[in-house]
Amino acid sequence: MKNSETLEKFKKNYDLNGTAYIEKDFTPFSDDQFLKISEYCNNVEKEFVEVGDADEPNHVHVGRFMTDIKKPEIVDNLYSNKLIDILWSKNIKSYIQFIVNTNDEIYLRRIQYNQINKDCFVGYHLDIDSNPDYLAACVLQLGKNFDGGLYRVYNKNNKKSFIDYKPDYGSLLISDCQYPHEVTKVTDGERGSLVFFVSKNPDLNKRNN
């Protein structure tokens, strides 16, 4: 793994604040992997979404690689399996396990690309409302030039208290799914990110059971 002292800092931030913000040079992705991910996300077919998976108000274009309605299902397109091969390579999986402080087996449950254009946003929500077994959301920033679009994470016990993260190109956010959050309105440019959710449960989505 990369600089262990720095990774410990990320792990501590995740534990204390519910989110680790990781600069590009410290993510587990190689330059080649990052370029391939960008290509897949750029080319995947997208749909406009106004209501999110946690029933939150949205205004976002979404490209899907894996869905999690009743159970995790890989979307049939040219890119899903290639993307999964990258995301679940051994070093990336172990990196995420380290940050979220678990030795348990973890699984991919949902993977999507979120394209947020000017005046668009992702509303306030809890990821565990989509699936109560979600452990962490991992957000890889692919957008370069945009204003606004802050990743805002709220204190679990006080909605008036929050931390804003301005994600730089190539950065990775790993966020505890028990913390409410939103993406504020993009005021200029286009914000694009790959979002994938991990869980200790590979089976049926308990939201629907």
Predicted regions, residues:
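Non-heme Fe(II)/2-oxoglutarate
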Residues: 1-99
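Catalytic core of non-heme Fe(II) oxygenases with the double-stranded beta-helix
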Residues: 93-208
